Amino acid sequence: MYICAALYKFVELNDYKELREPLYQTLIANDVKGTLLLAREGINGTICGTREAIDNVLNYLRSDERFADIEHKESPSDEQAFYRTKVKLKKEIVTLGVDWVDPKSSVGTYVDPEKWNDLIADPEVLVIDTRNEYEYAVGTFEGAINPKTDTFREFPEYVKQHLDPEKHKKVAMFCTGGIRCEKSTAYLKEQGFDEVYHLKGGILKYLEMMPEDNSRWNGECFVFDQRVTVKHGLEQGEYDQCYACRMPITAEEMQSEHYQKGVSCPHCYDKTSTEQKERFAERERQIQLAKARGEKHIRDGKLESLS
């Protein structure tokens, strides 16, 4: 059994470049895989390893007083959820593309999972899913609005086009683990919205804490690792993922004539060229050869990025 740990903290890191190598070496020494992002504004990422290994990495982080109170969310995985270990230097730990937004100085009101149902049931509250469209398609909260964004960078434009602080007096937002809402609520506060709320700990904490029979969540939750999706109780979901377009796909979609493992699916069959399909097919062949040898291909096509 492996443990996936999602973590983030907005904190001033003027020496973030110097933090990279010792953090990377700590991950390697403990055989922990995944991606951590470092920027001047903080740290963000998801890692996976054994119980002991994850504890070692968290203890290492918390030995730095700036990370002493860093929170993390855990979920189980039957196998290693990542194939590589990466520590990246970034301009932002989650990319909104608006330099002046600072969650350390202004952020929305946190709402605990056990109080979330009552909040989103209020007809005066506008509930917005701040994730990308392919994430929304897999599952979301009852009554939530889909901004139809392909990246988080598009969210400010959505706000500009569709939200008005004079009209929308109460806004509640949610995302996978909470980090996107740190920035989206900070952005709305700066735009003059007064009552802005966000789900503390994100969807993952809600699915961990709320019994399914008392839940207002419909579907599964997309995660950026080999599990693809998780369900209530953070159990692994039923979706797979298409290598070509990175879209989550159902068992039914895998029965489509347009589905070929590692090559295409109904979402992308008409969007890739013959040359691309041939390249994907060769890559899938190499993956299967590696598996036959009892090895893991360095990248098996499932999404490892954070957005």
Swiss-Prot record:
Residue ranges of domain Rhodanese in the record: 121-215
Record-annotated membrane-spanning stretches: none
Active site: C175 (cysteine persulfide intermediate)
Keyword vocabulary terms for this entry: Oxidoreductase, tRNA processing
PROSITE patterns recorded: RHODANESE_3
tRNA processing is among the record's keywords: yes
Known catalytic reactions: uridine(34) in tRNA + AH2 + O2 = 5-hydroxyuridine(34) in tRNA + A + H2O
Gene3D superfamilies reported in the protein's UniProt record: 3.30.70.100, Rhodanese-like domain (3.40.250.10)
Xref: InterPro entries: Rhodanese-like_dom, Rhodanese-like_dom_sf, TrhO, TRHO_N
Enzyme Commission no: 1.14.-.-
Pfam families (UniProt xref): Rhodanese, UPF0176_N
BP GO terms, sorted: tRNA modification
GO terms assigned for molecular function: oxidoreductase activity, acting on paired donors, with incorporation or reduction of molecular oxygen
The protein's role, per its UniProt record: Catalyzes oxygen-dependent 5-hydroxyuridine (ho5U) modification at position 34 in tRNAs.
Family of the protein in this entry: Belongs to the TrhO family.
Protein name: tRNA uridine(34) hydroxylase
Organism: Idiomarina loihiensis (strain ATCC BAA-735 / DSM 15497 / L2-TR)
Gene name for this UniProt entry: trhO
